[in-house]
Amino acid sequence: MNTFKVQFFSPDNRISFDEVVSLSVNGLEGELVILAYHSPYLIYLLPGIITAQMSNQTKEKVVIDNGILEVANNNCSIITNQIQVFDHLTHDEESLKDKRVGIYLSYLDVKSL
Protein backbone atom coordinates (compact mmCIF):
# COMPACT_ATOMS: atom_id res chain seq x y z
CA MET A 1 0.00 0.00 0.00
CA ASN A 2 1.39 3.40 -0.97
CA THR A 3 1.77 5.84 1.91
CA PHE A 4 3.19 9.29 2.58
CA LYS A 5 4.19 11.47 5.53
CA VAL A 6 2.11 14.36 6.90
CA GLN A 7 3.50 17.06 9.18
CA PHE A 8 1.56 19.83 10.93
CA PHE A 9 3.42 22.93 12.09
CA SER A 10 2.23 25.77 14.33
CA PRO A 11 4.13 28.26 16.49
CA ASP A 12 3.38 26.12 19.58
CA ASN A 13 3.21 22.57 18.31
CA ARG A 14 4.32 20.01 15.75
CA ILE A 15 2.45 16.82 14.87
CA SER A 16 3.67 14.17 12.46
CA PHE A 17 2.00 11.10 10.97
CA ASP A 18 3.89 8.44 9.02
CA GLU A 19 2.23 5.91 6.72
CA VAL A 20 -0.78 8.00 5.73
CA VAL A 21 -2.87 6.48 2.93
CA SER A 22 -5.10 9.51 2.28
CA LEU A 23 -5.59 13.00 3.68
CA SER A 24 -8.91 14.89 3.44
CA VAL A 25 -8.76 18.69 3.72
CA ASN A 26 -11.02 21.69 3.02
CA GLY A 27 -9.57 24.53 1.00
CA LEU A 28 -10.89 27.57 -0.81
CA GLU A 29 -11.47 25.39 -3.87
CA GLY A 30 -13.51 22.81 -1.92
CA GLU A 31 -12.71 19.42 -0.44
CA LEU A 32 -9.48 17.79 -1.55
CA VAL A 33 -8.13 14.27 -0.97
CA ILE A 34 -4.35 13.81 -1.10
CA LEU A 35 -2.96 10.38 -1.93
CA ALA A 36 0.60 9.03 -2.05
CA TYR A 37 2.76 10.45 -4.85
CA HIS A 38 0.38 13.37 -5.40
CA SER A 39 1.77 15.97 -7.80
CA PRO A 40 3.31 19.08 -6.19
CA TYR A 41 0.53 21.27 -4.86
CA LEU A 42 -0.02 24.38 -2.74
CA ILE A 43 -3.42 25.33 -1.31
CA TYR A 44 -4.90 27.71 1.28
CA LEU A 45 -6.80 25.71 3.94
CA LEU A 46 -9.96 26.78 5.72
CA PRO A 47 -10.43 26.22 9.47
CA GLY A 48 -11.79 22.77 10.23
CA ILE A 49 -10.99 19.11 10.65
CA ILE A 50 -8.35 17.32 8.59
CA THR A 51 -8.72 13.53 8.43
CA ALA A 52 -5.75 11.23 7.85
CA GLN A 53 -6.53 7.63 6.88
CA MET A 54 -3.64 5.55 8.21
CA SER A 55 -2.24 2.32 6.72
CA ASN A 56 -3.48 0.36 9.78
CA GLN A 57 -7.08 1.40 8.89
CA THR A 58 -7.37 3.95 11.73
CA LYS A 59 -8.26 7.59 11.22
CA GLU A 60 -6.50 10.52 12.84
CA LYS A 61 -8.34 13.83 12.99
CA VAL A 62 -6.67 17.18 13.53
CA VAL A 63 -8.43 20.51 14.01
CA ILE A 64 -6.67 23.49 12.43
CA ASP A 65 -7.04 27.22 12.04
CA ASN A 66 -6.49 28.77 8.59
CA GLY A 67 -3.38 27.34 7.02
CA ILE A 68 -1.33 26.44 3.99
CA LEU A 69 -0.82 22.91 2.68
CA GLU A 70 2.14 21.97 0.51
CA VAL A 71 2.63 18.61 -1.20
CA ALA A 72 6.11 17.77 -2.53
CA ASN A 73 8.24 14.63 -2.81
CA ASN A 74 5.61 12.34 -1.24
CA ASN A 75 5.44 14.59 1.84
CA CYS A 76 2.62 16.86 2.95
CA SER A 77 3.30 19.87 5.18
CA ILE A 78 0.57 21.95 6.81
CA ILE A 79 1.46 25.29 8.37
CA THR A 80 -1.20 26.88 10.58
CA ASN A 81 -1.65 29.10 13.63
CA GLN A 82 -3.21 26.40 15.80
CA ILE A 83 -3.42 22.61 15.72
CA GLN A 84 -5.17 20.19 18.05
CA VAL A 85 -5.58 16.42 17.74
CA PHE A 86 -9.33 15.83 17.66
CA ASP A 87 -9.37 13.09 20.36
CA HIS A 88 -7.74 15.47 22.83
CA LEU A 89 -10.25 18.17 21.97
CA THR A 90 -13.14 15.76 22.55
CA HIS A 91 -11.66 14.72 25.88
CA ASP A 92 -11.34 18.37 26.93
CA GLU A 93 -14.96 19.02 25.96
CA GLU A 94 -16.07 16.08 28.12
CA SER A 95 -14.15 17.40 31.13
CA LEU A 96 -15.69 20.84 30.61
CA LYS A 97 -19.13 19.24 30.41
CA ASP A 98 -18.48 17.46 33.74
CA LYS A 99 -17.41 20.77 35.31
CA ARG A 100 -20.58 22.49 34.04
CA VAL A 101 -22.73 19.71 35.53
CA GLY A 102 -20.88 20.03 38.85
CA ILE A 103 -21.37 23.80 38.91
CA TYR A 104 -25.07 23.39 38.10
CA LEU A 105 -25.52 20.81 40.90
CA SER A 106 -23.76 23.16 43.33
CA TYR A 107 -26.13 25.93 42.24
CA LEU A 108 -29.15 23.68 42.92
CA ASP A 109 -27.80 22.78 46.38
CA VAL A 110 -27.39 26.46 47.31
CA LYS A 111 -30.81 27.36 45.88
CA SER A 112 -32.53 24.64 47.93
CA LEU A 113 -31.18 26.07 51.22
Curated annotation (Swiss-Prot):
Tell me the membrane topology, using the record's own terms: Peripheral membrane protein
Which gene specifies this protein's sequence?
atpC
UniProt function note: Produces ATP from ADP in the presence of a proton gradient across the membrane.
Q: Which UniProt keywords apply?
A: ATP synthesis, Cell membrane, CF(1), Hydrogen ion transport, Ion transport, Membrane, Transport
Look up the record and report any one GO term of the cellular component aspect.
proton-transporting ATP synthase complex
Q: Which InterPro entries match?
A: ATP_synth_F1_dsu/esu, ATP_synth_F1_dsu/esu_N, ATPsynth_dsu/esu_N
List the Gene3D superfamilies: F0F1 ATP synthase delta/epsilon subunit, N-terminal (2.60.15.10)
Quote the subcellular location field of this record: Cell membrane
Recorded protein name is ATP synthase epsilon chain
Q: Which domain of life is it from?
A: Bacteria
Q: Which Gene Ontology molecular-function terms are recorded?
A: ATP binding; proton-transporting ATP synthase activity, rotational mechanism
Q: Is this entry keyworded Membrane?
A: yes
Classification via SUPFAM superfamilies: Epsilon subunit of F1F0-ATP synthase N-terminal domain
What family, per the record?
Belongs to the ATPase epsilon chain family.
The record's subunit annotation is: F-type ATPases have 2 components, CF(1) - the catalytic core - and CF(0) - the membrane proton channel. CF(1) has five subunits: alpha(3), beta(3), gamma(1), delta(1), epsilon(1). CF(0) has three main subunits: a, b and c.
Q: Does the keyword Cell membrane apply?
A: yes
